[in-house]
Amino acid sequence: MGIQLKNINKSFNNVEIYKDFTLNLPGNEISCILGPSGCGKTSLLNMIGGIIHQDSGSIEGLEDKIISFIFQEPRLLPWKTVKANLEFVLKDVNLRKKDEIVERNLKIVGLQDFSRFYPGQLSGGMKQRVAIARAFCYPSNLILMDEPLKTLDPKLKWGLMKTFLNLWREDQRSVIFVTHDVDEALVLGEEIFVFSRPPVKVKKRYTNPLNEEEKDMTNMEFFRQKNKIMDHLD
């Protein structure tokens, strides 16, 4: 089941960010929210995640949702090892099953040899891979991603996108991914929603036509689809 936002209103300091805003997000897909910085993308995630509340309107489809987050910064516990950071979200799982889940996810993100390392011993990209693995260890059915690739260089970003897709294919869940980067949207998003500046409207809903081979920034079809989306961006 998807998520429906109906007639959402939200203001900050008397500035209307959302006014009678309605949006339907599909279930069990990667939905990408694409728009300029400051347009309210993070606020949307925070409303869905229950971190903040809308002034009025309703959000439906969350009744059965268990949510995990992937933030811009990894937010790992520095006094715990990589393995212990993942185990931390598996408190109610027996030891054998816990080890199995942690080992599987660390292997998919390519960090099986770093399980005893501490966050301070890892690079920024490695920390974010741990954060992604942790989100998939947690028994959630909805993952909210708030620009987790924003501060990374292009090579690291590309590797992390592939890492995320590998995990998602192994364990498909509903994902809402926020970004201002068209390349990220085309690589990760199945449905792409282009937001305007506030008060927010959906300028374009775009079903991603690219296959796996075409999800390459050097591919001509990728370049063509990127230009189509950019025509709708503020």
Across the structure, where does each feature detected by a protein language model lie?
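ABC-type ATPase nucleotide-binding domains, specifically the catalytic core motifs of the NBD
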Residues: 53, 84-99, 108-109
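Catalytic Walker B motif of ABC-type/P-loop ATPase nucleotide-binding domains
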Residues: 143-147
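Helix-to-loop junction immediately C-terminal to a conserved catalytic motif
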Residues: 49
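The feature captures the beta-strand-to-loop junction immediately N-terminal to the Walker
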Residues: 34-36
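Hydrophobic anchor residue at the start of the ABC signature
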Residues: 132
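Conserved signature/switch motifs of ABC ATPase nucleotide-binding domains
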Residues: 117-120, 138
